[in-house]
Every structure is written in structure tokens, then in C-alpha cells.
Amino acid sequence: MLKRLFQLFMGTTLASFSIACVVNSTLGAFPTTGANIAIGNWLGVSIGISGFLVEVVILGILLYLKEGVSVTGLVNMTLGSVLIDVFITLLPVNKLMVIGLLLSGFAWGLQGMAGLGETNNNLLMTAILKRT
């Protein structure tokens, strides 16, 4: 169990780092990160806080649909949101930061290998697909 939790922690940390890299590359963002940036600008809060708020809404929808909630989703929602803000402030703004695209696949692979469930976004997509 300790190994699985370590994989989840490392995957979440690396995923947060990769998201911060992509944001600081100024070349674009992942779709959900782009939404978090837009909501953060609209509310006047950081990307991490807006990401947390979006995850809370997704969690509410999942609970309303009587879908399961995973440890991975909860860790991403809390720790991931904090780490994104930390890494965005620590990393330089540079086009070379697009390296985050390569790191993201490895990060989410680590989270998946931990076997502690899917992220909230994946759970929501699965719930929608089951109902269509």
C-alpha cells in the first residue's frame, strides 16, 4: 500500500509540475487547464484555486450521479491544486517549458499504476458515456 501511495504522490507531483511547465511555456495549455485559467481570471484567483473549485463541482456532479469517488481524484483535487500554484511561481516563463507535454503522460501513467482509481475528470467522462 505504501508503494501505491508513493506512486500516487509522485504522479500527482509530476502532473502538477507538467501543467505548470505548459502554462509557463506560453504556447497554450491542456483543455482543462485552459478552463481553469479562464475561470481563475474571471474570479480573480490563481489557477490552482480555480482548478480546486472546478474539481469540487465535478465531485458534486459525480456524487449526484451516484458514481464512485477515487483516492486519486481527491489527491489531485487537493494536493495537485496547491502544487500547481507553487510550481507556476517557481518555474521560469520560457517556450522551452513545453517539455511539460512529455512529462504529463509519464505523470498520469504513474497515477494510473498506483491503482487507486481514476481522476475526477475521467470518472465524469465515464459517467457521461454510460448515460449516452
Please place each PLM-identified region on the residue numbering.
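Core subunits and conserved enzymes of cellular information-processing
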Residues: 1-132
